[in-house]
Amino acid sequence: MGKLGISIYPEKTTEKEVLDYIDKAGEAGFSRIFSCLLSANESREVILEKFRRINWHAKEKGFEIILDVNPRVFNDLGISYDNLSFFKEMNADGVRLDIGFTGLQESIMTFNKENLKIEINMSNITHYIDTIMDYRPNRDNLIGCHNFYPHIYTGLGLDFFKKCTENFAKYGLRTAAFITSQAENTFGPWPVTQGLPTLEMHRDLPMIVQFKHFVALEMIDDIIISNCYPTDEELEEFKKVRKDMVSFSVSLEENIPEIEKKIVLEEFHYSRGDAPENLIRSSNSRVKYKGHEFKLFNAPEIIRKGDIIIESSEFGHYAGELMIAKKEMRNTGKSNVVGRISEEEIFLIDYIKPWQKFSFVEK
């Protein structure tokens, strides 16, 4: 993945709270800011001064700053698409066009003298991005970002999301999407506060699980927290989670032997290329520990989806191989269930593709 991001809404809170949040997020590994101008209703001078101070602080902490705008904002602030110097004065690194222009204007904007990134709204299936590409933009300054959706049931479906994202990915453009905090009394740019996910299926999931889902999909570069303010505990999880692969949270059997525990938590895992229908197979451990006696110690009659299996020596040359159950199945009596993936993360199994890497962390 690319960057972890946060969102800030200076007109909705105090400047101190915004700056404190930026500091906390920076310490947790975040390096991108989505800052909304759509709901800012002050004068040009007041907006410039307020955002400049905040953005300067953020840049001192190593953040990239993208401002969310639309044609109305351009009009209200007296900005022309061929002169973006106002945003540079605000210490921004780019602008996100919530609503676009004609395609030609966006192309011209990517050649702006200030070298600002021009971010396009990804959450639609039209030929909008194709039109922009027809006008030969500066690809180095063209990126994409999905919307978030405050109203329950209005978030994107997964299939639609994939189609929208693929439309941008085919051009090799950097992409972004939003996850939502589950903290109480959060807010965004609008009065409705029922969470702010890109995907509807994420609305009630723990924020770290939403993140892991995007990592599993392998379609999104930058992942941004949309609402303010996540809890310290939510931010803390991002210090520990792997960003380069899905890291399943697991509970291990109390009597798991040391070698089996080491296989789960320390060995390098990836799904075999000849991926079966019922299991995710990680075979390296059976080679590394060839000759070790894997005794039967927990062979339940039924293996459930989400169970982690390490084959016993009664399975011959399969002994020591790690598997994840993708479906419920009857145990042959030779398979040890050594642990189980957290219930809220079991659905992530369905998104692990052949050769995809994954890991485990004990709860």
Label each region the model flagged.
Residues 2-19, 68-79, 193-205:
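Active-site mouth loops of central-metabolism enzymes
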Residues 17-39, 89-94:
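Catalytic domains of carbohydrate-active enzymes, especially glycoside hydrolases
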Residues 31-54:
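Glycine-rich, proline-tolerant flexible connector loops at the mouths of alpha/beta enzymes
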Residues 121-254, 263:
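Catalytic alpha/beta core domains of metabolic enzymes, predominantly
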